Structure formats: structure tokens, C-alpha cells
Amino acid sequence: TELLAKHYGWEAHFEDVIDNPYLNDFYNHMERWSFNLQIYFLKSRFEQLLKIKNNDGSIVQDRTIYEDAHIFAPNLKSMGLMNLRDFKNYQELFDLMESQIQGPNLLIYLRSNIPNLVNKIHKRGRDYENSISIEYLSRLNERYEAWTSTYNKGKLITIDVDELDFVENKKDFEIIVEKLDGELKEIGAA
């Protein structure tokens, strides 16, 4: 997100992981804090979308409101980490919010295998992420694949990043930019 914002001159909107009062608690006791965390992210992303709606410039967001509703919350429910009552409450709130927003012009899905994801998580160095299980990551990956295969809110580009290190390697970043340039021209955003 940061690299794309800098390259294209876009305004960046990041996932709130620093000020999030539930994140550390969630990773220590997922079942207890899953609903609170998902509601916090839903509120945070909706606030971002309201700001974006009133902005004339180009924006890049590191995670969409749709990912929580179609991937993270359902994953927590299916793993028994969010009960059905809380999940339904969450979904109804998401549905209400979704009726007030517009999908992104372009969604970029960075596809990655589990070993690569684990490596990136460790590189980030966030202590609270040390307890993330392989099962949890695998289920998220499966849900991302299913969701992106039916995504219909706008244009979607999938980039396999298993062999790319676009943060450390400028040539790898240029590969991504080249792919994006073509898509941006196609949607009239270049």
C-alpha cells in the first residue's frame, strides 16, 4: 500500500493495527474477542470509506471492508471462534453499511502460499501475531480464493507474490506496477 501510494501519488489508507484496542487480546483469546475485533475493524473501515467518498483524489486501501465480511468473520464462525448470534449481528450491520458504499474501482489480490505468509508475518515482527496457527492461515487462504473467484464489486487483479519480494526488490515492484498500469488504463484511471 505504502509503495503504491508513493509510486502513483495516491493517498494511502491503512488498517488500524496500532490503535486497535482488541488486536492483542484477540490473538491471545480468539473466541472471547473475535466479535469485538470484527466490529472494530468494520467501524474503522466504514469510517475510511466515508472519508474516501468525500475525496476527489485517488486512494489506495490496504484492506477492504469486504474482506472482513466475506473472509475473516465467516472464518471465525466456521472455526467456532464466533458464535452464530454474534455472526448474524455482524453480518446485518455489514449489510446495512454496504448499502451506503461503493466498491473499489480496482481490487488487488496478492496471492501467496502459507510458508510465504508465515515468513512475511515473522518479518513484520508484531508480537501478537506469533500465535497465529497454520490452520487459521490456511482457512483464510481458502476463503480468499473462494471469494476472489466470485468477486463482482469491480475490477479484480490477482498477483501471485510467492516468487516476488516487492518490498526489498525494486525489479519485483516494477513487475507489479507494470501489471497495474495495464489494469488502470483499462478502467480509465491511468
Predicted regions mapped to residue ranges:
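A glycine- and Lys/Arg-enriched "phosphate-lid" helix/loop adjacent to the NTP-binding pocket
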Residues: 70-145
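Hydrophobic/aromatic beta-strand patches that form the interior of the parallel beta-sheet core
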Residues: 13, 61, 106-108, 157-159
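Short glycine-/polar-rich loops that comprise or flank the Walker A/P-loop
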Residues: 10, 101-106, 152-155
